[in-house]
Amino acid sequence: LTFVARQHGEAWTRPFVAVYEPSTKKEPSAIQSVSYFDAEETVLKDFAGICVKSKNGRTDHIFSLSDATQTATYQGMKVKADYAVVSNEYAGNRTLFLGNGTQLVAPGVTVHTDQAGNVLLEKKQGKWYILSSVPCTVVINGKKIKSGITSTGEMKYNNAQTTINSVV
């Protein structure tokens, strides 16, 4: 497979974003649709937003900014980062990723860091897991959880019982 893409304009003022999904006859595409969205901040010229809907019910909103100090907002989601992914909850699972950033706000979840870093927050079969490169604060459904840097952190969030393991 060879793929060539050319973008008209400067990459640092107009980010280029693409969605790739390998598929075969045995394992067909899981993507149902791809659409694009604009940030609510009309002054953002260097923003790209993609909404990827999967056949399994998962929807990912992908945010890309060339300046991590700027904020992009869309339908109640707010991101202050170079890159972020916000998924909906589907089959008891959910994924949120903050890439080189300090803030991610999504329905029911807030992630904040004092310095730019990467934070992966995943809900798998009803349990939350976190992996972060910098200390972060996570709020889930109004419950504040202060976290350090984690390597394989597990955050259990069941019936108001929260523990974070593997905090370095």
PLM feature spans:
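Non-catalytic terminal regions with compositionally biased, polar/charged low complexity
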Residues: 3-14, 21-168
